[in-house]
Amino acid sequence: MLSLKKSMLLLFFLGMVSFSLANKRSDGKRADEEGEDKRADEEGEDKRADEEGEDKRKRFLPFLIPALTSLISSLG
């Protein structure tokens, strides 16, 4: 059976892999949107990308912070 330390590290790395895959998927969607939306100016695209980045951080940080704190406390 996995120890708590190993299971927390495994959970952390699985989370990072899923986050990486989600970023790749959103990059592909963004490329499709840019192909359809060629008339949009650069400022509008930058603003949309910034908003998408903020949304990703808002979804990921609540998961990451408790996982990291529990990982640190289990290692210490």
Swiss-Prot record:
InterPro entries listed in its UniProt record: Frog_antimicrobial_propeptide
Top-level taxon of the source organism: Eukaryota
Annotated propeptide span(s): 23-55
Residues bearing the modification Leucine amide: 75
Keywords: Amidation, Amphibian defense peptide, Antibiotic, Antimicrobial, Cleavage on pair of basic residues, Fungicide, Secreted, Signal
Subcellular location: Secreted
Tissue expression pattern: Expressed by the skin glands.
Disordered as annotated region, ranges: 24-54
GO terms under biological process: defense response to bacterium; defense response to fungus; killing of cells of another organism
GO cellular component, one term: extracellular region
Signal sequence coordinates: 1-22
Main function: Antimicrobial peptide with activity against the Gram-positive bacterium S.aureus NCTC 10788 (MIC=50 um) and the yeast C.albicans NCPF 1467 (MIC=150 uM). Ineffective against the Gram-negative bacterium E.coli NCTC 10418. Induces a dose-dependent contraction of rat urinary bladder smooth muscle (EC50=2.9 nM) and a dose-dependent relaxation of rat tail artery smooth muscle (EC50=37.7 nM).
Family designation: Belongs to the frog skin active peptide (FSAP) family. Brevinin subfamily.
Protein name as it appears in the record: Senegalin
Origin species: Kassina senegalensis (Senegal running frog)
